[in-house]
Amino acid sequence: HYELVKLNLYNPAVKEYLKEVITGWVKEFDIDGLRLDVAYCLDLNFLKELHGHCKWLKNDFWLMGETLHGDYNRWMNPEMLDSVTNYECYKGLFSSFNDLNMFEIAHSLNRQFGKEQWCLYTGKLLYSFVDNHDVSRIATMLNNKRQLPVIYPLLFTMPGIPGVYYGSEYGIEGDKHQGDDALRVEYNEEKFKADGVADLTGEIAALCKLRTSSKALAHGDYTPLQLLNRQFSFRRDCDGETVVTLLNIDDNPFDFNPGIGGEYTDVITGKKIDLSGSVHLDGCSAIVAVNK
């Protein structure tokens, strides 16, 4: 991006200016955090200084950075950023659906958040997404549009902090190859309703309600249950709360066998559900069940 100014983050005057700007935003607007663009290009010592200044302003000030590849712990650690963008799982989300290969995203989730000592980010809070202002919308990326109601339950219940890009709750499309304007359209709810390929607002609202109240989804353990090419299930657990996610990306129905006792409620439909035996899912559907 040659049109953007490149600041010298080794220059003390530049660093002080940036700190003053952040201080001004906190004092004037009481902001709670910052999202740092291309954080992977920033000097690591500057990130440490920024961290110290922001936490001095507010001890719960949130610092999130844009990262793409590599070990995210390089930027996300107690001295630098609180969270980073999880592009590894972003890729795994849409390509697992398109290739009908849920092993890909399951591998990434276990690699990042599993219980083994070698897992990379267990207990950390990465920013999860299926689209944003830099990539094609998920309704464009998915080959089978029927899978749209399945990918958001996965996004909201996998470890991490889920984000929804405006307009995608209506399934609107946008192709990155057509430029930024195609991805960053004017907010027009009526047009979104008319142009979208799937109205996901009810489902996403239910998932948001669960996510904001659920300790299991915010901080719980991640345990895979059943994995096939076109089906995937897992559970999240914390302080007696359990959330079980069942995903069927195939066009045909499938019967899961979670083998989990207790009374559960499907948060999407509001219906009681028994997970102790066989659980039937229609083609391209999902169940998110909670025991509280």
Predicted regions and their residues:
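Substrate-binding clefts and catalytic carboxylate motifs of secreted carbohydrate-active enzymes
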Residues: A106-Q178, F192-D199, S214-L217, F232
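The substrate-binding groove and active-site-proximal loops of carbohydrate-active enzymes
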Residues: H1-K15, D32-C41, S96-F97, D134-N144
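Soluble or luminal CAZymes and related metallo-dependent hydrolases
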Residues: Y10-L18, L42, F46, N101, ...
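Active-site groove signature of glycoside hydrolases
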Residues: Y17-L44, S128, N132
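Substrate-binding/active-site clefts of carbohydrate-active enzymes
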Residues: H1-E28, L50-W56, N73-R74
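Active-site-proximal helices and loops of the catalytic beta/alpha 8
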Residues: K27, D37-Y121, L154, G171-A206, ...
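Structural preference for beta-strand elements that scaffold enzyme active sites
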Residues: I31-R35, W62-M64, L125-S128, P162-G163
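Carbohydrate-interacting/catalytic domains
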Residues: P159, V164, S168-K292
